[in-house]
Amino acid sequence: MDRKELLSRPVRDLSITADTRLGDLMDQFSSIGGFTAAKIHEAYEIIKDMFSEDNTTFLSFPADIISTGLRGLINEVVKRKLVDVIITTSGTLDHDIARTYRNYYCGSFSYSDIELRDLGINRLGNVLVPDESYGEIIEEKVMESLEKLYAKKKEWATVDLIHEVGLDINSESSIIYNAAKNNIPVFVPGITDGSFGSQLWSFYEQHHDFKINLLEDEHRLSDIIFDAKKTGAIMIGGGISKHHTIWWNQFRDGLDYAVYVTTAQEYDGSLSGAKLEEAISWKKVRPDARYVNVYGDATVIMPVLLAPFL
């Protein structure tokens, strides 16, 4: 360790007013010291290079944030073509479709779930989802699309199916519509785990020659991975979305850039709690990669982190 180098960046006080822009605040975060703010700045710098270089950028996230207003931020990122590939869950399709046509409502974590059940209201954290805003509307819209797609051909890669359903939605408020419009592939490795997947099963029960080709999705992902000069990933939360992102990147010796936003901890034993450092041992992140783990609530961190790019 070099003493002079270690003492080269003094901690500086924040200087902010009501007119301070987020980009300026982000620059000040570089010398704030402390905890999350410094990590957010590091993530910002990594994402800035990720977006500016000849890099294939993955965006992975779970479904729950799409039930919140963060859907609008993700949608704007997709509209602006800031990312090249999305990897997410079946629930993302559910919430994106449902919220295109129906409202979800602000509530509380402390409401009685027994009473909510009796009222026909589902609780997702502090978001309230009435029965009529979820299953019924998803079934109606997905089944309409499946009938049309089945008439075209009997076997579909999931990524193509999502593309076509997105085009059918034809609403600027929809993530999968804008992804389809901008030719950003949306991969859902756990497609049957959700209402969208249940509609696929239900349709299959009536049309046994209807097939979903998941291996074609993996073939498409392999082409993306092996054609990429560099890869980077913005990963919000963990689970299958995060793992499928880093899993495929091991076949090119790992991600060159990685930003992981999470509240999970290593001691819970989950993939969500695993730091990016652990992924280096699996060759899912390169040893010389630029990466950072940012701990905190994505609904707070992501708007601050991404707003300067919008």
Curated annotation (Swiss-Prot):
Q: Which reaction does it catalyse?
A: [eIF5A protein]-L-lysine + spermidine = [eIF5A protein]-deoxyhypusine + propane-1,3-diamine
Q: In which pathway does it act?
A: Protein modification; eIF5A hypusination
GO CC entries: cytoplasm
Q: Which InterPro entries match?
A: Deoxyhypus_synthase_arc (IPR022899), Deoxyhypusine_synthase (IPR002773), Deoxyhypusine_synthase_sf (IPR036982), DHS-like_NAD/FAD-binding_dom (IPR029035)
GO: which molecular function terms?
Answer: deoxyhypusine synthase activity
**Which keywords fit this entry according to its UniProt record?**
Hypusine biosynthesis, NAD, Transferase
* This enzyme's EC code(s): 2.5.1.46
Q: Active site at which residues?
A: 284 (nucleophile)
Q: Per its Swiss-Prot or TrEMBL entry, what cofactor is needed?
A: NAD(+)
- Sum up the protein's function in the record's words: Catalyzes the NAD-dependent oxidative cleavage of spermidine and the subsequent transfer of the butylamine moiety of spermidine to the epsilon-amino group of a specific lysine residue of the eIF-5A precursor protein to form the intermediate deoxyhypusine residue.
Report the family membership: Belongs to the deoxyhypusine synthase family.
Q: By what name is this protein known? A: Probable deoxyhypusine synthase
